[in-house]
UniProtKB/Swiss-Prot annotation:
Extracellular side: 105-111, 167-182, 234-243
Organism the protein comes from: Danio rerio
Family membership noted in the UniProt record: Belongs to the TMEM163 family.
Protein name, entry field: Transmembrane protein 163b
Transmembrane segments: 84-104, 112-132, 146-166, 183-203, 213-233, 244-264
């Protein structure tokens, strides 16, 4: 009677629903979601994790080239070996061409042949630098090593350009006329064809590996190919028009200026980058 009367009494106060249910503990619902150390991640931990992920990315100036994002490890090593093979072939072939061109320049008084001989010597040196650049398998993507190689190439370019310019200007000042024969033609054609083929191979590998050093080596081979054909052109022109004796020396000056400009630009671009990546020598 008491319960029914109290339930029907409109003046009675509200019934107490009891204590409110507490929010479930995530750790009790899913034990796997709790870290092993019992510590839940907070904002500081999330920030540290993001920072670590950024540090691990190859494009944050951490001393890696763009090729580290494009190539898989086995692909990078495959292209590295190809670059080494091309460099060895370039060293052997251009050394033979340099000796032949020096012989032609001495025997036939050709300024452009001398320029090509020096450029072939430069090609040998640049290929040796590329060999050093890719000698370490772990440093295939090392930007710091890449920039050092480019700076050395820039210095060699400038020194070679000065020598070529001095020789060409001297020949023009003394009105030295080149002598034309079959030996000169043979060296010119072989040099032009071989250097052009090497240039294409180096440019392709340099593009894949994003290597400025390989591209620079390819540019040097391109200059060698142009100079090889220029020897042929200037000799043929002089054979039919002796009054155009200055063409040979003029081409030598032009090539010297091109090499000089490229060397200066290389130093201007790469010296600041060496300073930026000097703390990232972990692959050396």
């Amino acid at each position: 009677m008491t319960d029914s009367s109290s339930a029907s009494d409109p003046t009675a106060g509200p019934v107490d629903p009891g204590p409110a249910p507490s929010a479930p503990d995530p750790a009790l619902e899913d034990p796997a979601s709790t870290p092993a150390n019992g510590h839940h991640p907070n904002q500081a931990d999330s920030f540290n994790m993001e920072q670590q992920m950024k540090i691990g990315e190859p494009e944050d100036n951490a001393g890696l080239l763009e090729s580290s994002m494009r190539l898989k490890p086995h692909e990078a090593q495959s292209y590295r070996k190809k670059a080494l093979w091309v460099s060895w072939v370039s060293i052997v072939v251009t050394m033979i061409l340099a000796i032949a061109a020096f012989t032609v320049s001495i025997m036939r008084h050709s300024a452009s042949a001398f320029g090509f001989a020096f450029d072939a010597t430069l090609d040998v040196l640049s290929s040796i630098i590329v060999l050093w650049r890719y000698s370490n398998a772990a440093a295939v993507h090392s930007a710091h090593r890449e920039y050092i190689a480019c700076v050395i190439l820039g210095v060699v370019f400038i020194l070679s350009a000065i020598t070529i310019l001095v020789k060409a200007i001297h020949d023009l000042a003394t009105k030295l006329e080149p002598e034309v024969d079959d030996f000169l033609y043979s060296v010119s054609v072989i040099s032009g064809v071989v250097c052009t083929v090497l240039c294409v191979c180096k440019f392709m590998l340099g593009k894949v590996l994003t290597s400025r050093a390989l591209i620079t080596d390819g540019f040097n081979s391109l200059v060698g190919g142009v100079m090889g054909f220029s020897i042929l052109i200037s000799a043929e022109v002089f054979k039919h028009e002796p009054s155009v004796w200055f063409l040979d020396g003029t081409i030598g000056i032009l090539i010297g200026l091109i090499i000089l400009a490229y060397g200066v630009k290389l130093l201007k671009d790469m010296v600041p980058r060496i300073r930026q990546t000097r703390h990232y020598e972990r692959f050396e």
